[in-house]
Structure formats: C-alpha cells, structure tokens
Amino acid sequence: MGLLSQYMCERAQGTRHAIVIDPADQSPDVAANRALAAANAGSRMILVGGSSDTDMTNVHATIVSIKEALELVTWASTQDSDSDENPSQIPVVLFPQGAAALSPDADGITFMMLMNSKDPRFLIGEQVRGAPFVKKSGIEPVPMGYLICEPGGKAGEVGKADLIGYDDHER
C-alpha cells in the first residue's frame, strides 16, 4: 500500500472532505488560493481535474501552484527551512478527465473507471493510455469506480453515461 492509500485509510475513522478544483475554471494562482481556503476550512485532499477539456500544461501548472502554496504555508508555520516535516501534508491528487491531463508532480491519481459509461474509452481506454505515464512518473494510482446519477451534468455528457435515475432501484 502506497503512502497516499495509507493516508486515505488512516483517515477512514474521521470526517473527511476533498475538494475538486478544475484547472479550466481559473488560473493556477487562483486555484492555489482556493486550495488554501479549502485546506483552512478542513479539506484533507485536493483533487485536480474534471470533465473539461484541459491540457497537460494547465493541469501541471495548477498542481505545481497548489503544492507550492501548501509548502509555503507549512514552511511559514514552522519557520524552519531545515525541517524534516512533509511540506505538503494535504495530498494533491489528479482527478483527470483522461490521459491527456496528467502531471508528474501530483501525489497520486484517481485511476477511475466510469462504470456506467456507454463508451469503452471511459471504461478502460483512458486508463490504458495513461498507465505508462503513471508508471514512469511514479505517482501513486488509487483505484476508483465512478457512477453518475441523474441529472448527470457535464460529466455525464462527456463520459457518455447511462445515467442512474432517481427511482432506479434495480440496477
């Protein structure tokens, strides 16, 4: 079990909150400020990604900006540049829309299968495309099954989800 998986399991007994920051919605600096605000409010994980068409450059810049901001806050609180303390105690994890939106600086990646997609690309295709990058970069994959319910929103549309209805109790 990797460090990120251990972190997630250690926190299984308490309340947890993760925030999703979509790099397409703001600049990397604004994303870093939002991540800091979320961390100050109690978020214990920052997920970077979403259903938008975001390229690797934007995702990478957002991850780097968030991690630098978290490191600066940690350093400022210790005022010890020689501290052995982990600079980013809140993991920054990729929540990618596909293999074209990755960064080697992430602490991990949700390696997800959109379980109710009608498109094989979202069932296994993007995972196959992204696997060599994940292995080469050494970022920790976190297996994840993902279901989209009605109304589905942009993620349901992009992922070609066979939406689970409000009253659909048999699936």
Regions found by a protein language model. Give the residues of each.
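Hydrophobic faces of well-ordered beta-strands that scaffold small-molecule active sites
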Residues: R16-I21, I46-V48, V92-L94, I109-F111, ...
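Conserved anion-binding
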Residues: Q97-R171
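N-terminal amphipathic alpha-helix/helix-capping segment at the start of soluble metabolic enzymes
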Residues: M1-I21, Q127-P143
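Glycine-rich, proline-tolerant flexible connector loops at the mouths of alpha/beta enzymes
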Residues: M45-I63
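Generic structural signal for hydrophobic
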Residues: A37-A38, I66, A101, R171
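Short, acidic/polar
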Residues: Q26-A37, Q97, Y166-E170
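Alpha-helix-loop-beta-strand connector modules within alpha/beta enzyme cores
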Residues: T57-G98, G130-V142
